[in-house]
Design a protein with these regions (language model features):
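Nucleotide 5′-phosphate-binding alpha/beta core
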Residues: 1-100, 106-155
Length: 155
C-alpha cells in the first residue's frame, strides 16, 4: 500500500500538470499550431508524409487543402502492411502495437497503429491528466493512501 510520502509526491507532481492545461486553455490556437507542426515534422520522411509533401506544409490551411480525409478502408492496405512489419508508413519510429476498435462499421474490428510516442503523449498522458484534474478539484484527497480498483481494456 502506498505511503503518505508517496501520496504527497504523486499529488504534487500531478498538480504541476494543471499549469500546462491552463496554458492550453488560454492559447488553444497556438498550442494546436504547435502540435500540427510537431506532427508534420515527425512524419515528413514517412510514406504518408512524402505522398502529401508534409515538408512544405507550414499552415493548417495548407494541410487542410493538401491532405484529404480518408476512410479506414482507403488506408486498410497500408495498415495491413504496417501490421506485417513494414515501418515508416504512418510514423517515423517503429510501430509495435495496434489498438483494436470495436468494429462499429462493417462489423469488423479495425487496427490503429500506435507508436511509443502515442502511448506516452495520448494514452498515458490522458490518465495522468484525469488524476491531475481530480487532485486539483479535491485538494484533501487521500487517493493514493488506500486501496483502489482499476479497470482497463477491451477484449
Amino acid at each position: 500500500m502506498p505511503t503518505p510520502l508517496f501520496h504527497s509526491i504523486a499529488s504534487w507532481f500531478l498538480k504541476k500538470r494543471i499549469h500546462q492545461m491552463e496554458h492550453f486553455i488560454k492559447f488553444p490556437i497556438e498550442v494546436q499550431q504547435q502540435v500540427l507542426q510537431n506532427l508534420l515534422y515527425c512524419t515528413t520522411q514517412t510514406e504518408i508524409g512524402k505522398r502529401h509533401e508534409f515538408s512544405s506544409i507550414a499552415t493548417y490551411e495548407t494541410f487542410k487543402n493538401r491532405v484529404p480525409v480518408v476512410t479506414y478502408e482507403e488506408i486498410a492496405d497500408d495498415i495491413e502492411r504496417c501490421r506485417k512489419g513494414t515501418q515508416n508508413i504512418f510514423w517515423s519510429t517503429p510501430i509495435k502495437w495496434f489498438a483494436k476498435s470495436s468494429g462499429t462499421t462493417n462489423a469488423k474490428s479495425k487496427f490503429i497503429p500506435v507508436s511509443n510516442e502515442a502511448l506516452e503523449e495520448c494514452h498515458y498522458k490522458a490518465g495522468k491528466d484525469m488524476l491531475s484534474l481530480y487532485f486539483n478539484n479535491n485538494e484533501n484527497s487521500q487517493l493514493f493512501t488506500g486501496k483502489c480498483l482499476r479497470l482497463a481494456g477491451s477484449k
